[in-house]
From Swiss-Prot:
Positions with a binding annotation for GTP: 32-39, 59-63, 77-80, 144-147, 178-180
Residue ranges occupied by any EngB-type G domain in the UniProt entry: 24-199
Magnesium found in the keyword field: yes
Name by which UniProt lists this protein: Probable GTP-binding protein EngB
Organism listed in the record: Stenotrophomonas maltophilia (strain K279a)
Gene responsible for this protein: engB
UniProt xrefs under PROSITE patterns: G_ENGB (PS51706)
CC cofactor: Mg(2+)
InterPro entries: G_ENGB_dom, GTP-bd, GTP-bd_ribosome_bio_YsxC, P-loop_NTPase
Length: 200
């Protein structure tokens, strides 16, 4: 799996449903607040520094970006959510687009929700997790930027989030600690994603 995911390459970007690639194979989508470290997580998972653009301006990703791992397997970078500078009409467009993507996309096999370990489970995070659970999709939460906390603080946050997720979603959502800086949890996350994509 680790070698396969490192083959990820940019495939295409979609601004609306008509631009989506054929609904076949397997896809894993990545969602997260605009400053949660989603692009950095994608880069760490694929061991590529510039696969997903890391922007100084949160909310820069304004389309669904597809990265091809194999001809039958893709990673999908969803627009960062919760950023105030994105106009309301554009927010509404993305909400409708993502809603339709989740409701109709047969290739979608799992959702990774990226959350800053210091500020987990915001309303937007819960909304994305609910999308997945309602569709019967497995979801996996990455508590990113773990290197900002001590090991004991990491475990304390992990236990708290795990308890909340279990209460809200049962066994539908798993969670782990993650850091792109020191590569904490990279192999664990790759294992989850590889299983969903059929690469294991």
């Amino acid at each position: 799996m680790s070698l396969l995911i490192e083959r990820a390459r940019y495939h295409l970007s979609a601004h609306n449903v008509r631009q989506l690639p054929p609904d076949e194979g397997a896809e894993v989508a990545f969602a997260g607040r605009s400053n949660a470290g989603k692009s950095s997580a994608l880069n760490a998972l694929t061991r590529q520094n510039a696969l997903a653009r890391v922007s100084k301006t949160p909310g820069r990703t304004q389309q669904l970006v597809f990265f091809q791992v194999t001809p039958e397997a893709h990673l999908v970078d969803l627009p960062g959510y919760g950023y105030a500078k994105v106009p309301l009409d554009l927010q509404a467009h993305w909400q409708a687009f993502i809603d339709k993507y989740f409701r109709t996309r047969e290739a979608l096999k799992g959702l990774v929700v990226v959350m800053d370990i210091r500020h987990p489970l915001k309303d937007y995070d819960r909304q994305m997790l609910s999308y997945a659970v309602q569709r019967g999709l497995p979801a996996h939460a990455l508590l990113t930027k773990a290197d900002k906390l001590s090991r004991s603080q990491q475990m304390q946050s992990l236990q708290k989030v795990r308890k909340e997720l279990q209460s809200a979603y049962g066994d539908s959502v798993s969670v782990q600690v993650f850091s792109g800086e020191d590569r904490t949890g990279v192999d664990e996350a790759r294992g989850v994603i590889g299983g969903w994509l059929g690469l294991e």
